[in-house]
C-alpha cells in the first residue's frame, strides 16, 4: 500500500503560529504534496509562499506520522518542518490562497482550542520549544 506524502511547515511570527482553515473546517499547517524532483525543504518553502505569500527558510524536520482523513477515508504521510520567515516578511500580513477559507495567527494557548489534528499540535509545540531555546536552525540528529 502506498500513501501520498504531505510536507507541512510550522511558521512563527511574534510568538504566533500561522494556520490555514481548510474545506473540512479544520485548521492546518501550510504545505502540500511532495512532487517528483522536489526536495521536502523546497516543497515547504514554495507551498508556504503559494498559500500565504510569505517567503520562508526551511529548518529541521519536527515530526512525521500517518494521518487518517476520516471524511474521505484515506491516509496521508505527513512530515512537518520548522520554517523561519525571511527578512522583511514579518511585516507582511499572510494572505489565504483560494485553497483555504481563512488564514490566522494564533498563540500557543489558542491552538489548544482549535479543531486541529494532534500531529500538528505536536509539531507546533516542538517548534515553539526549539525557537524559545534558540535551536530553531539546528539540524535534527
Question: Across the structure, where does each feature detected by a protein language model lie?
Answer:
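Short secondary-structure boundary/capping segments
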Residues: 1, 9-10, 18-19, 69, ...
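Charged phosphate-binding loop/patch that engages nucleotide di/tri-phosphates or the phosphate backbone
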Residues: 121-141
